[in-house]
Amino acid sequence: MREGMFIKKNVDKWNEYQHNPTSDPDETAERFITLVDDLSYAKTFYPRSKVTRWINSIASAIYLSIYKNKKEKYSRVFTFWKYEVPLLFKKYHRLLLFTFLLFSLFVGIGVFSSIKDESFIRGILGDSYVDMTEDNISKGDPFGVYKSDNPFTNFVYIAMNNSFVALLMVIGGVLIGIGTIWAMWNNGLMLGCFQYIFFAKGLGFQSILVIWVHGTLEILSLVIASTAGLVITQGILFPGTYSRLVSFKRGIKDAMKIMIVLVPVFIIASFFENYVTYLMGNTFDKQSSGGLPVWAGILILTLSLSFIIWYFVIYPIQLHKEGYHIQKNGAIKLTVKPI
């Protein structure tokens, strides 16, 4: 085929490929294969022609776009954890503070009610649980509740259960926050009552070292899950410039991102509860010789608290000050401030 005829037959197609790129991966692959065929033909019969260089440039551009998209699939995970999630929390910092204060209030009510009437504890935690705990304390093994014959099975169960409870807290936001706040109320009262039992028995310091080795991640993650639920509620009640439906969908999307982040945190907390808390419990068990040093418990507790405060509070503020922000389309953008 003469070069002129070859160009006339394919020029419209090449122009289309060059000036109207497609986002459809199947279409992109088909275009690339077609161009490779055309390029092979051109190199065979018109090796020094300008049209050969033109086809090569179009094919190269498509190849680079395929490579870039493949690379972005991996960088997307990195961007999600390093920028998207922290900036998302910067957006909801006031809501996070409100949720934390509200949950703390519920815990305080649990403690105060227990001080005024110890029968309140049994009404919240149940007679069997309170009797078991008091029996363990009398036997010199106050934290025997954390001992398990099959720690791995317990680890899996607790991780799944905590994730499920957190998901219910998130979904509760759909009910104008009633479900979320009700879950916070129940968990706050239980925590306040449970913690008071040990303080009332003179085991306050020991209970902090044992319970909060895993509880720091677990409880604060439940607070964050409650925040995610209230994000949905906020989207329903305060749509701003968006329609209520669009605002609701955006709230759901943000809440699910938060939930994704919490799953690995719950897994770590469950690991701590079944292996580290167990060892800390042995530290204060009069009949056990194997336990974890007190300094190790303090270190784990401190690192857990530091991680939550840094990743969900301090780091988002730092990113915001550096000029990073989330655009309406969800993209991360760095705005360089003029000197």
Question: Model features per residue range: what roles?
Answer:
Residues 71, 76-93, 144-145, 149, ...:
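Cytosolic juxtamembrane amphipathic/interface segments immediately preceding
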Residues 106-110, 165-168, 173, 180-203:
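Small-polar-interrupted transmembrane alpha-helices in polytopic inner-membrane proteins
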Residues 123-168, 191, 199-201, 206:
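Interfacial loop/helix-cap signal at membrane boundaries in integral membrane proteins
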Residues 195-302:
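Hydrophobic alpha-helical transmembrane segments and adjacent short intramembrane/lumenal linkers
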Residues 320-339:
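Short, highly charged, low-complexity non-transmembrane loops/tails of multi-pass membrane proteins
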